[in-house]
Amino acid sequence: MTLPSVSSAPSADGVWHNCHLLPDADPAHAIRDAALVVEHGRIAWLGATADLPDAYRGAARHDAHGAWITPGLVDCHTHLVYGGQRADEFAMRLAGAGYEEIARAGGGIVSTVRATRAADEDTLFAQAAARLQPLLAEGVTAIEIKSGYGLSLEAERKQLRVARRLGEHFGISVYTTFLGAHALPPEYAGRADDYIDLVCNTMLPALAGEGLVDAVDAFCESIGFSIAQTGRVFEAAARHGVRVKLHAEQLSNLGGAALAARHRALSADHLEHLDEAGVAAMAEAGTVAVLLPGAYYFLRDTNLPPIALLRQYGVPMAISTDHNPGTSPVTSLLLMMNMACTLFRLTVPEALAGVTVHAARALGASDRHGRLEAGRVADFALWRIDSPAELAYWFGRNPVATVVRQGRVHAHEGASA
């Protein structure tokens, strides 16, 4: 299915009626027999139909046919722009090959780096657009896209430019994250500190100066970068006034989450090996825990993130696809909601918050996404469901009817707006 570009989508202005509203993730805030008004691409009013102000009663009408309307979903951790795919590596892993064996055979992240460097921007755009479209069709209206498969200034710039282009073409809010400290490129083998010099002193200043960087991330693991090296990246980000995020505690506990908290990171992501000290540090700093059940499932991990501790300390939990070619080649945020409930034992309200209010917070965008509020840009989704709990209940089914992104209507099969 090819989704139209934003320029061809009709305006959502008018009164959306015959609907039920879930303004945020709290079921107690649900409004039945509701209406929502859009003016000039922004939400002007929402509430019970009986309370609709007289000023709007003559406006254009959009019959929701009994649908539930929620905020647009937010996918807050993706690696959507890259060249090629790694299905052969998947087959090797199923046959028992480990990370090092796959790397020696020319696979792993280096294979994606080669493909990404070789592809031009138009090719990367076409491939990423195909990956993005299923997410758009599931009601995603804001997405984070990381670099990290270029590992050179030119190739990282190319990834980030494509990410910006996706946002412009599809009318979706794209938040770009510079992940230059993702892996060591082949030309820097054995010289990790020299590569971090390049990331901090050349790549980041150039890309931030070009307006391509909304946040900075790093892969802090024994097979990635050390606490000291990650700290250098975060210090460089601070010099450029850019917030940070971190891949932390996925494979081991190096203390990455605590480091992220010291730098007031927006989020720490993965967290399968997070301990109580790290949880406490995140709680104090207000750092969001981004859970990535797709990678957990794909890697057949057995170490669960400490959900009970995250709840106990009040750490907000977001959920994301972590779309990437090596460990989470998934393009369904709804499936990740189901997996977060079934694998990580999140409640349905936690899952709903994880793809709305908490995901928006993980992007530093709580004022723009994750809630239905008057004054905000009209980003919302209409669902053919009897209860919002169905969004986490179904898997392999997309109950979306219509998606409104940036004040424009994108209708899907079976929908009428």
UniProtKB/Swiss-Prot annotation:
What Gene Ontology terms describe where this protein resides (cellular component)? cytoplasm
Q: Name one Pfam family in it.
A: Amidohydro_1
Q: Which GO terms fall under biological process for this protein?
A: L-histidine catabolic process to glutamate and formamide; L-histidine catabolic process to glutamate and formate
Q: Which SUPFAM superfamilies match?
A: Composite domain of metallo-dependent hydrolases (SSF51338), Metallo-dependent hydrolases (SSF51556)
Q: What is its EC number?
A: 3.5.2.7
Question: Is-annotated flag, keyword Iron?
Answer: yes
Q: Which positions bind N-formimidoyl-L-glutamate?
A: Y149, N324, G326
Which pathway features in its UniProt record? Amino-acid degradation; L-histidine degradation into L-glutamate; N-formimidoyl-L-glutamate from L-histidine: step 3/3
Gene Ontology terms for molecular function = imidazolonepropionase activity; iron ion binding; zinc ion binding
Q: Which reaction does it catalyse?
A: 4-imidazolone-5-propanoate + H2O = N-formimidoyl-L-glutamate
Q: What is this protein's record name?
A: Imidazolonepropionase
